[in-house]
Every structure is written in C-alpha cells, then in structure tokens.
From Swiss-Prot:
Keywords: Heme, Iron, Metal-binding, Monooxygenase, NAD, Oxidoreductase. CDD domains: CYP_PhacA-like (cd11066). Belongs to the cytochrome P450 family. Pathway: Aromatic compound metabolism; phenylacetate degradation. It catalyses: 3-hydroxyphenylacetate + NADH + O2 + H(+) = homogentisate + NAD(+) + H2O; 3-hydroxyphenylacetate + NADPH + O2 + H(+) = homogentisate + NADP(+) + H2O; 3,4-dihydroxyphenylacetate + NADH + O2 + H(+) = 2,4,5-trihydroxyphenylacetate + NAD(+) + H2O; 3,4-dihydroxyphenylacetate + NADPH + O2 + H(+) = 2,4,5-trihydroxyphenylacetate + NADP(+) + H2O. This is 3-hydroxyphenylacetate 6-hydroxylase. Induction: Induced by phenylacetate and all its monohydroxy- and dihydroxy-derivatives. Induced by phenylalanine and tyrosine. Pfam families: p450 (PF00067). Its EC number is 1.14.13.63. The gene is phacB. GO terms for biological process: phenylacetate catabolic process. The lineage of its organism: Eukaryota, Fungi, Dikarya, Ascomycota, Pezizomycotina.
Length: 517
C-alpha cells in the first residue's frame, strides 16, 4: 500500500511539476549510483589487508597517476610489504618486498599463474591478432605457447642465435660510429638501439632483418609497438577500471587503440605473407615461425604462433631497448664505471679487438655484473605484468580468494633495504658480494619472462662491444640518469628515459673501422 502511494505521489509530481521532477531525477540517479557503487566497492575489499582508502568510483586511481610503482613503495612503509588498493571497484594486492614476493610468487607459483584481462588491451587492441604470452590468462593454449617459446629461448637455442647477435650488435656499433661522425657529433642513441632490438626480433621470428633505421618498416613498427605498450599500462587507461567510461563514443583512447591494432595487423600480415612466399619457393632462412610450421608434431595454430611472435617483438623493444638507453645515459655521467669496465675488458681483449668475441658467454665478470646492476637499478618494467589467482591461497594467516589481482612491484623489490644495505646506490660490485641475491626485473614464478637468457646474452654483447669500441662522453646539456627523475612517462608500462645526446668517441678508430669493414 505504501509503495503504491509513493508511486502515485511521484507520478503526480512528474505531471504537475515536470521540470522540477526531471531536475530531481538528474540529481538523484547519479547519487544513487554512487551510493550503491560504494557498497559494492566496500564489499569487494579483501578481509585482513590494510591499504589506503580511495575516492568514490575511482578508488586509488587519482593517487597513483604520477608514478604508481614509487607510490606503492612509499605506501609499503605505512601499510607493510603486502597491502591492498582499489582501482575503480577492483581490489588489488600489491607486493613490495623480496621476502613477500618469494612466498606469494615463488611458493604459490601455480596458484598465481593467470593474468587479469583489461578492457583496452585485451578487448580492443588484442581482439584480432591476440595477446602476447605475457598478457594471456592461464589456459591450455597458454601452456602450448609457453612450451613453444621455452623451446625457442632455452640455452641451446640461444647459443644457436650467436651469429644473429653478432650481426646486429656489430651493426649497432657501426651506426653509433656513422651517425656520431666518429665521435664528433652528439647523437641520441635510441633509434640505433631500437633497430638492434627490432632487427633481432624479426630475424629470429620471420628470418628478415631491418638493416637500417631509415627503412619504412622500422618507423612503423617502433611507433605502433610504443603506443601499444602504453595500452598495457595498469594505470594509464581509466576505462579499464571505470566501466561507464567505455560508453563514451568519443573516447580518444578507444579510437587510438583501434588504430594501433589495425596498423599492427597490417605489418604482421605482411611479415607472415612474405615468409609463406619464401617457404613456398624454398628460399626462407631458419626462424621460429618456419620451424614450427614445418614441425609436423607441433600443436600450435596460427593464432598461437602469432602470439609467440608478438611476444618476441614487444619483449625486445620493451626490455632490451629501454635498458640499453638508460645504461648509456648512466655511463656517460659515470666515467669511473667506464674505467672499471674498460680495465676488466682489456684483461681479455685489447682495444685493437673492439668487437671482442661474439661467442663470449658473459666471461667478463665485471661487465656481467654491470648488466645485472643496470637491470636492478632501472627495473624497466617497474610493475611486472599483473597476476590473477586461479585458486584460494593463504598468506600471513589470511585467505586470499580465487580471482584476486596481484601487482608485483618489481621496482620496490629490487630496491628492498632488507636485501641491500645501499639499494639507491648504483654499484655493480654488489653482485660479487651477493651473487645469489634475487632480482625481479624479469618477474618471478611461473610467469617469469621466458626470454631472460637471450636478453642477458644480448645485453652483455652490446655492453662489451660498445665499451671496448668507444668512450661515451656527455655533452654540455644535463643528462638525468636517475631512475625516477629521468623517467619520461611514469604512467607508461615501460620506464623510458628522457631524451638525451652523447658522444661515442672511438678508442682506436683505425682498428674499429677495420673490424666493422
């Protein structure tokens, strides 16, 4: 009876005072939505875990827009190494210490083997060519792809790629010499580093090189992959966490995601078609795609094969490219590090052997330690790709339900004061003192990066050849090499350094020219 009377009253008010009624509705409906959403958001929190309270609708999104990984590290000093945040309505457990990461991602590796799906990347960017291995939820297809990638990236396979590493790293040194005019002209090395990573990825996957950064394919792939990397960010796309924003037909984010997807599909199709033509003519070179296609026992379909190729493409451009760019900026400002590296290299190779031995498997201990310290100090993927639990797990006496999203703050773990007494210092020698210390740059557990062996081998060869060929000198312009202050876009998935220029001065120009020829 009361409900009927209330409805009658509302109806009468709507008829007698339509403008007032519409105004009241326009105010009441959003308010009711916010109130109901707050109840939903509060009930979604994981019992037992502390964390910063957020704002209605958006949760903690506003607080992490500047630099999420560093903000998470700061919060860990207040709430402990594992706490929860909310991105929109989604509760997320953030892991910020090496010890906690070992328990959650090491001891519960299988339980944390899946990935969450985000609207922008999974539903828009990846709805045609599919996802990379690293961004795929757990499935039987993922297991097949991981097996295929592991076979292509294990130690014997990496050893078989030495020729390609030799060719591309030699071309890298040649470009530094060419575009730097023998040390006379300051250059931004980013394009040279990108060509190195891209050409190696294309060679391994499709059997084709990018011989010069002046090729049209170079510009297209590097631009598109850079934009797509931003769509994988866990903080840069508000519509991933606030569903109502997806209804906006004028969303520039969605339009840009679709554009990048279409452009990527175009060059993937071209690379696949050209390989098919070469295979039909019998002129193809051995590569991952061709090997799988010709392997009658392989159980990968075309979508799964593309997933492996996308993984190699994005992984090289993300990790190796960015790490080398950061490292050169540091070396230009730290001649003491260059001197130590040069002394160690010269115990094995003279300046008359600028390109060293491409088959050298990280035998120069100081250069190997330098690579590891660069990986730790810069942590180019500050937040490892997120995980989702596929079953309930218990941590610190608290039950974490199935379906919970986890962020591994690799930046905080690599800077853990419980592991290092001086985490903020750049010091390669720490890896002689603690050779078995954990490093989180490649992730941890079941979904750890499968390409770490190849990346380490490539980085070592690039470092030793560059440092034995050139003296890296700064210009008059300041280079910000600090991992926080020098980050060009803290909202991006990958921490990319701000642009800079340096001089690559040959140590022995006659020997270098002879070696490059």
């Amino acid at each position: 009876m009361a409900i009927a009377e209330a409805l009658l009253f509302v109806n009468n008010r709507a008829v007698e005072h339509p403008l007032q009624f519409l105004t009241a509705v326009a105010f009441a409906v959003p308010l009711l939505y916010v109130v109901i959403n707050e109840f939903i958001r509060a009930s979604a929190r994981i019992p037992g875990f502390k964390g910063p309270r957020g704002l209605p609708l958006i949760g903690n999104l506003a607080q992490i827009r500047k630099d999420a990984a560093e903000q998470y590290r700061i919060w860990s000093k207040i709430y402990g190494p594992v706490y929860q945040i909310q991105l929109g309505n989604i509760p997320v457990l953030v892991v910020n210490s090496a010890a906690a990461a070992k328990v959650l991602f090491g001891q519960n590796a299988q339980a944390l083997s899946s990935r969450p799906e985000f609207y922008t990347f999974h539903k828009i960017v990846s709805n045609t060519a599919g996802t990379t291995i690293g961004t795929s939820p757990y499935s039987e297809s993922l297991k097949r792809r991981r097996k295929g990638a592991a076979s292509a990236l294990n130690r014997p396979s990496v050893e078989s790629y030495v020729h390609h590493l030799d060719v591309e790293s030699k071309a890298f040194v040649a470009e530094l010499f060419k575009y730097g005019n023998g040390g006379k002209t300051p250059v931004d090395p980013m394009a040279m580093i990108q060509r190195l990573s891209l050409s190696l990825a294309l060679t391994l996957n499709w059997g084709v090189r990018v011989a010069s950064q002046e090729e049209e394919l170079f510009d297209e792939i590097t631009e598109v992959e850079d934009k797509i990397s931003k769509f994988r960010s866990t903080t840069g796309n508000l519509q991933d966490y606030i569903p109502i924003l997806r209804l906006n037909p004028f969303s520039s984010n969605s339009h840009k995601a679709k554009e990048m997807r279409d452009r990527r599909d175009k060059y993937l199709s071209s690379l696949n078609r050209d390989l098919d033509d070469r295979m039909e003519k019998g002129t193809h070179k051995p590569c991952i795609q061709a090997n799988v296609i010709l392997d009658k026992e392989a159980k990968l379909n075309s979508e799964e094969l593309t997933s492996i190729s996308l993984t190699m493409l994005s992984g090289g451009l993300d990790t190796v490219t960015t790490l080398v760019a950061w490292s050169i900026s540091l070396l230009a400002q730290r001649p003491d590090i260059q001197d130590k590296a040069a002394k160690a290299i010269q115990e094995m190779y003279s300046e008359g052997q600028p390109l060293c031995d491409p088959a050298d498997d990280q035998k120069c201990a100081y250069v190997a330690a330098l690579v590891r310290e660069c990986l730790r100090y810069y942590t180019v993927l500050r937040l490892a790709l997120p995980r989702t639990s596929i079953r309930d797990i218990t941590y610190d006496g608290k039950v974490i339900p199935k379906g919970t999203v986890f962020f591994l703050n690799a930046w905080a773990c690599n800077m853990d004061p419980e592991v290092w007494s001086d985490p903020d210092e750049f010091r390669p020698e720490r890896w002689f003192e603690q050779p078995d210390a954990p490093m989180f740059t490649y992730g941890m557990g079941y979904r750890m990066c499968a390409g770490s062996l190849l990346a380490n081998r490539e980085l070592y060869l690039v470092f030793i050849r560059t440092l034995n060929s050139f003296r890296i000198e700064p210009t008059e312009e300041k280079i910000e090499w600090h991992p926080l202050k020098g980050n060009s876009d803290p909202t991006s998935l990958v921490a990319i350094p701000k642009k800079y220029k340096v001089r690559f001065v040959p140590k022995n120009e006659v020997s270098l020219v002879e070696a490059l020829s």
